[in-house]
């Protein structure tokens, strides 16, 4: 049998053995060492079998392999070191050896160099230099290896200071490419990942000559507790990487959605109150946060040790206990934080001094020591509460809260915060852990106060400065999601927590109730704006009754916008901004007018018609033609469209000469942050489904639909559409393509609909059970239905087809996509113009669940 195949089989069998030992909870350190030793044996045996031991070539392991750590599918990095020139025979044999290792299914990284070339390249490239630091001789001339070993430890190879600067800059560049809290993190290169631990080890190796992290304790650079924490973090990340390699069967460091469940299972997690995958990711996010803090502190200490005080930092006294050293705050006593009050007082000074951006490393070390020693929550201490309220009331309080969160003091102060640290939700909507999302929400509140944000958040920038007490909004933000992961309604549970906190901290009853109300209702404005018909006066009146007054409305608006923007980078767009602003101003008018005075519907219709007619007459449209056209339209049409929309539609219809052909309009300007699409044609079965199928094929998102029929059975359907990135459809060629595709489909009595797109890789791991619920309708003769389902391609077209088959007419729709979930709201009636009865509701519900659940199952398999 081919020896390469035998080697390949032996590696497969060894991986199976390693996996069995991993499942049996063998320490991961043993497994990565065992893997390395096995590869050592295989490589050295192959070296001898190829007769390479007769040549003066040193076979050297470098990089992670040189460290003696190998995960199941890690790269095997080799340096073939020689002096002078290689003979042709040696070159040929070496090529055959490398090919053998590839055939054996080892991921080989290799270089063939002379000693002089190796040192020259190492001096020019920090990556090569780092790999050489971990060089380990496998076989070959020891004297040649010793020359390399001695040369790379000379100061003229890389000075300790230059090496530190290069590795620090390398890390900064790497961190800029990804967040520690990505949904699909790279566990090796993300901030707080394995590379950050290795960076500490590399800098130590270069500066102290240390070969292991443990030696840093001997050099009194690392405290025993810090070493234990670093090794504990490394242990978990190694286990995670090992399981990831086993799950995907290749060298992979990205923890992608489609393997997270399998990795969690291999790690031994089981579904309980929290999903297994959420438990695993919570541990991961907490681990990387710890690594990030240790990395920051130790590299700051290394900087002092390697660079010294090359540039004197400005020192400014703050009080008897603190001073500012450059951009860092420094405690003047190592035992200052033995008083719990001073742990919080530190951040009061940070809030008060805009020049402070971080904590000086020795002070951070003292803070970490004191934080671990706390036996009860800091909020139990009255002096801590007093200091915390100072932070909350200060204009720069959020900057201080941000650092409190970063360094674990917020969780030491507020026990409930600890519960949400690292808490993720296994979905595509929440891009961050609950604590990181809340942290970003706080930063958004801070952004609203900045003049440069007025263009992006025009209303929020005004309201934030009009709030009676900004600190109450900050408290509402801190508590809005604090009860997530406990089970039950997190809004109500969080509201109770918030009220208790306010009482403990001496807030008056009014302020405490306002904060609790904000927490309990933090989703109400978002849901109303995005999933209800806010052109309906009854919807706005109902929302106004929940809001109570203009002050509550302003607080809720600011919290809602900051919350949406902090959920993920793609959630906020101009369309959502316009919906929330419209709801804000509509509610403001209701509150100013008084909820008891309803809108005069007839007066509004006359007002809108008059404004539209004035503009149309100015454009040369004949009043007689206009009156004739509008007599065909129902009053509801004028209520649901602004005067400029009414004018746009009317002018196009009156100028449309091919009356038997469909009219499709796509606005060249944005309408409330989106692109408006208008379809006018003879109404017919499956019209909505046809339009949805075409738009899906064009990769267009539909966010709003108003489905209307004239008295003489013409469709007057309006849609708000956006590109996949949330931006309006603006390219002229794109607009023309959409219009032509719709005209072609609508011109046929039996159109051939395009095939739906395939489900994306990210969507496949998710299974959203289809839910259909009917709500109490406040509009005569209509039914209101909510649909929750997996957001599969062509979903709305399929829903429209089911409406047709169930003899149901769609009047309007609000389309909301929350990650992998579609949460859509429809206003329906029977084909006879009546409200659906219980039997009809049941039939429609069963048809939707049956059809969409089948699609859900097909898509995720």
UniProtKB/Swiss-Prot annotation:
Residues 1-317 are annotated as: Uridylyltransferase. It catalyses: [protein-PII]-L-tyrosine + UTP = [protein-PII]-uridylyl-L-tyrosine + diphosphate; [protein-PII]-uridylyl-L-tyrosine + H2O = [protein-PII]-L-tyrosine + UMP + H(+). Residues 434-556 form the HD domain. Uridylyltransferase (UTase) activity is inhibited by glutamine, while glutamine activates uridylyl-removing (UR) activity. One of its GO terms (molecular function) is [protein-PII] uridylyltransferase activity. Residues 676-756, 784-861 form the ACT domain. Its EC number is 2.7.7.59, 3.1.4.-. GO terms for biological process: regulation of nitrogen utilization. Transmembrane segments: none annotated. Belongs to the GlnD family. Has four distinct domains: an N-terminal nucleotidyltransferase (NT) domain responsible for UTase activity, a central HD domain that encodes UR activity, and two C-terminal ACT domains that seem to have a role in glutamine sensing. Modifies, by uridylylation and deuridylylation, the PII regulatory proteins (GlnB and homologs), in response to the nitrogen status of the cell that GlnD senses through the glutamine level. Under low glutamine levels, catalyzes the conversion of the PII proteins and UTP to PII-UMP and PPi, while under higher glutamine levels, GlnD hydrolyzes PII-UMP to PII and UMP (deuridylylation). Thus, controls uridylylation state and activity of the PII proteins, and plays an important role in the regulation of nitrogen assimilation and metabolism. This is Bifunctional uridylyltransferase/uridylyl-removing enzyme. The lineage of its organism: Bacteria, Pseudomonadati, Pseudomonadota, Gammaproteobacteria, Alteromonadales. The gene is glnD.
């Amino acid at each position: 049998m081919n020896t390469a195949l035998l080697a390949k089989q032996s590696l497969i069998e060894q991986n199976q053995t390693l996996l069995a030992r991993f499942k049996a909870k063998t320490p991961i350190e043993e497994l990565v060492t065992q893997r390395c030793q096995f590869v050592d044996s295989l490589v050295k045996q192959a070296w001898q079998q190829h007769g390479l031991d007769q040549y003066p070539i040193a076979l050297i392991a470098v990089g992670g392999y040189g460290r003696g750590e190998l995960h199941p599918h890690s790269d095997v990095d080799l340096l073939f070191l020689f002096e002078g020139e290689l003979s042709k025979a040696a070159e040929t044999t070496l090529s055959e050896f490398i090919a053998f290792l590839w055939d054996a299914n080892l991921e080989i990284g290799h270089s063939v160099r002379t000693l002089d070339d190796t040192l020259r390249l190492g001096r020019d490239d920090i990556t090569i230099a780092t790999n050489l630091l971990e060089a380990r001789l496998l076989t070959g001339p020891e004297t040649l290896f010793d020359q390399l070993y001695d040369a790379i430890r000379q100061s003229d190879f890389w000075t300790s200071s230059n090496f530190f600067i290069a590795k620090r800059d390398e890390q900064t560049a790497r961190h800029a490419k990804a967040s520690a809290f990505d949904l699909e993190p790279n566990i090796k290169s993300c901030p707080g990942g394995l590379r950050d631990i290795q960076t500490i080890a590399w800098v130590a190796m270069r500066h102290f000559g240390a070969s292991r992290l443990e030696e840093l304790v001997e050099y009194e650079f690392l405290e025993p507790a810090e070493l234990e924490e670093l090794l504990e973090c490394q242990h978990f990340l190694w286990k995670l990487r090992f399981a990831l390699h086993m799950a995907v069967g290749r060298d992979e460091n990205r923890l992608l959605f489609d393997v997270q469940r399998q990795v969690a299972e291999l790690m031994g997690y089981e579904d309980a109150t929290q999903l297994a995958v959420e438990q695993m990711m919570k541990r991961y996010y907490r681990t990387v946060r710890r690594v990030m803090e240790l990395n920051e502190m130790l590299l700051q200490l290394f900087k002092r040790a390697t660079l010294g005080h090359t540039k004197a930092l400005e020192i400014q006294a703050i009080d008897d206990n603190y001073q500012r050293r450059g951009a860092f705050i420094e405690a003047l006593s190592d035992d200052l934080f033995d008083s719990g009050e001073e742990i919080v007082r530190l951040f009061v000074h940070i809030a008060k001094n805009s020049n402070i951006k971080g904590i000086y490393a020795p002070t951070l070390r003292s803070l970490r020591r004191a934080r671990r020693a706390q036996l009860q929550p800091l909020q139990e201490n009255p002096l801590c509460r007093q200091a915390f309220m100072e932070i909350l009331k200060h204009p720069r309080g959020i900057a201080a809260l941000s650092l409190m969160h970063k360094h674990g003091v917020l969780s030491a102060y507020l026990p409930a915060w600890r519960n949400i640290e690292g808490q993720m939700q296994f979905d595509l909507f929440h891009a961050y852990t609950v604590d990181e999302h809340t942290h970003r929400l706080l930063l958004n509140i801070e952004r609203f106060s900045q003049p440069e944000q007025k263009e992006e958040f025009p209303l929020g920038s005004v309201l934030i400065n009009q709030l009676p007490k900004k600190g109450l909004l900050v408290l509402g933000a801190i508590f809005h999601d604090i009860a997530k992961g406990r089970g039950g309604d997190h809004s109500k549970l969080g509201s109770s927590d918030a009220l208790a906190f306010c009482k403990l901290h001496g807030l008056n009853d009014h302020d405490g109730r306002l904060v609790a109300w904000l927490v309990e209702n933090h989703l109400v404005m978002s849901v109303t704006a995005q999933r209800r018909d806010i052109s309906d006066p009854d919807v706005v009146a109902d929302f106004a009754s929940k809001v109570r007054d203009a002050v509550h409305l302003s607080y809720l608006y600011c919290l809602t916008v900051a919350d949406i923007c902090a959920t993920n980078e793609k959630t906020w767009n101009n369309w959502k901004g316009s919906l929330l602003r419209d709801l804000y101003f509509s509610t403001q008018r209701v509150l100013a007018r008084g909820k008891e005075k309803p809108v005069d519907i007839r007066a509004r219709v006359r007002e809108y018609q008059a404004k539209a007619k004035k503009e149309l007459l100015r454009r040369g449209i004949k009043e007689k033609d206009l009156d004739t056209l509008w007599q065909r339209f129902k009053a509801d049409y004028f209520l649901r469209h602004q005067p400029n929309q009414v004018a746009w539609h009317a002018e196009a219809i009156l100028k449309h000469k091919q009356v038997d052909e469909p009219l499709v309009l796509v606005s060249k300007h944005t309408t409330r942050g989106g692109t408006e699409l208008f379809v006018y044609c003879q109404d017919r079965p499956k019209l909505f489904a046809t339009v949805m199928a075409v738009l899906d094929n064009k990769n267009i998102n539909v966010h709003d639909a108003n489905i209307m029929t004239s008295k003489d059975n013409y469709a007057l359907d309006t849609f708000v559409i956006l590109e996949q990135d949330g931006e309006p459809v603006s390219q002229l060629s794109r607009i023309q393509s959409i219009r032509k595709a719709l005209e072609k489909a609508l011109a046929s009595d039996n159109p051939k609909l395009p095939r739906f797109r395939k489900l994306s890789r990210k969507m496949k791991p998710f299974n959203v059970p289809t839910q259909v619920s009917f709500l109490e309708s406040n509009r005569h003769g209509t039914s209101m239905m909510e649909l929750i389902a997996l957001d599969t391609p062509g979903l709305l077209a399929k829903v429209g087809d089911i409406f047709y088959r169930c003899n149901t007419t769609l009047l309007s729709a609000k389309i909301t996509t929350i990650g992998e979930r579609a949460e859509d709201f429809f206003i329906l009636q029977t084909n006879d113009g009546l409200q659906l009865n219980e039997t009809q509701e049941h039939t429609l519900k069963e048809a939707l669940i049956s059809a969409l659940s089948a699609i859900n199952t097909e898509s995720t398999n």
